[in-house]
Amino acid sequence: MSRAAFIAGDWGTSRLRLYLCDAGGHVLARGEGEGASAPDCAGRFAAAVAAWDKAHGALPAVLGGMVGSTIGWREVPYLKCPAKPAAIAGAALRFEVEGRAIAILPGLSCTNISGVPDVMRGEETQILGALRLMPKLAKGKHLLCLPGTHVKWAWIEDSTITKFQTALSGELFNILAHHSVLARDSGAVDPESKAYRLGLDLARDRYEDGLLHLLFSARSRVVTGEMAKDAAASYLSGLIIGIDVYAAVAASLSLFSAGVVHLVCTPMLAALYSKAITAYGLGAAVIDGDDAALAGLVHAHAEIFS
C-alpha cells in the first residue's frame, strides 16, 4: 500500500472535503467536515484528521476555498490576474499548527470584461486542476465555465488566467424559484425537458430584450395555459442560463479559440450548461468539479512542498 504523504482539503462555505494522498497525489482515504463559515476552523480540522494523524503523524496540508476568506481559518489576500499556476501556489499563506505545515491558497481578483472589479475564491483551485487533468488547455486561448451559485467564466491563455467574470445565475434562479411567483412549487429542473429548451430558445432569440423583460413569461405562460405549472422551473432555468451563456460567449469570442467551452462542475450543471452552449453552436467539454478541485490541490502541494 502507498505511504500517506499529505492532506488536501477543499474547504468551501458549507462543506469540507478532505483527501489523504500519497506522494503521487493518489487518494488513500477521504473525509468530510463542516464548512469554513462554522467557528473554530483549527479545532474542526484537527478533529477531522485525528485518525489520520494517529496512523501517519502530522502530515502537511494544502487547503483551498473559503477557508482563506474573512470567514475562514486565516485570510489570504487575493492574487491579481493575470495569474500563472506557479504564482497561485507561490502566493499561498504558509504556517504551522502543532507541528503540521499548512498552506492555504489565495483567491484571485481582476478587472473583468465589463471593466469592474471581480473576485473568486475556490474556483482558482478547480482551474489549476482542469489544467492538470486536460493538458491541451496549457497552450492557446480557452474559455472555462464554472457553474454554481455564482458562475465564474474564466479566460485562459497559455496556462495563465488572464481574467474572469462572475454571473449571479445560480443565486438568481434560487431566489426567483423559491421566493417569487415565477416558479414556486413547480418541481425540479429537467435539462431534457421541452420547457428548458423553450427557455433557452427565447433567451437566444430575444436576448436584446433583456432578462428582466423575459422573466415574467415563466408566470404568464402558466397562467394562460400555454405551459404546465410543473414546467416553470425548467423554463426559468433555461432563460437564466441561456442569457448567461450568450452574454459570456458573445462578449469574448476573440479571447478563446477552438469553439469549445470547458465546463468544470457537477454532472447536473454540466447537462444544463452543455445544452445552452450547444444552442449557440459551440462545443462543450466537461471536467468533473470535485476531480478538478482535488487535482488543483495536488498540483499546489507539489509546487509548495517540493
State where each predicted segment sits:
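Short glycine-rich, Thr/Ser-proximal phosphate-binding strand/loop in the N-terminal lobe
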Residues: A5-G43, I287
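Short glycine-aspartate micro-motif
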Residues: F6-D10, P60-G64, H142-L146, H262
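Glycine-rich phosphate-binding loops at beta-strand->alpha-helix junctions
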Residues: R15, A258-A276
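Short beta-strand-loop/turn "lid" adjacent to the catalytic site in phosphate-handling enzymes
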Residues: W52-P117, D158
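Glycine-rich phosphate-binding loop plus the immediately following alpha-helix
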Residues: S109-R204
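Glycine-rich phosphate-binding/hydrolytic loop that grips phosphoryl groups
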Residues: K275, A285-S306
